[in-house]
Amino acid sequence: MTNEYIPFLSKIKEIVKHTETEYTFRMTYVGEVRPGQFFEVSIPKYGEAPISVSGIGEDYVDLTIRKVGKVTGEIFELNEGSCFFMRGPYGNGFEKENYQGKELIVVAGGTGVSPVRGVISYFGEHPDEVKKLHTILGFKSPSD
């Protein structure tokens, strides 16, 4: 069993640049994780920041990060193949079974879309599992 309080080194598999200040980092990760959970990411000498999981794969997690401070600024300087520390996952996350057969309304904005992206994606791909899926998303500007 892994101790979620002990940081581990994770490698950047891929970087997707959405805007000048928002990137998605595909990080190596093997373990249980649910949409809505988050990791504490850290760069030694700069600190740590909580970042929500925006995507989950068999051997990775996606972290969509907005460049807003020292830690995220340093992460944005890294390249594919570079590493940073993570610990977690934390939070309860979203269990799809809680929403199956129901009308689902998802409201989110900005980088707050990241934690619910997995729920939207899953039920968007499996529409027969919910009565109806509504999404209301807000952003500062069209470029966001």
Question: Which functions belong to the PLM regions below?
Answer:
Residues 2-82, 139-140:
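Ferredoxin-reductase
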Residues 70-144:
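FNR/FR-type flavoprotein reductase catalytic core
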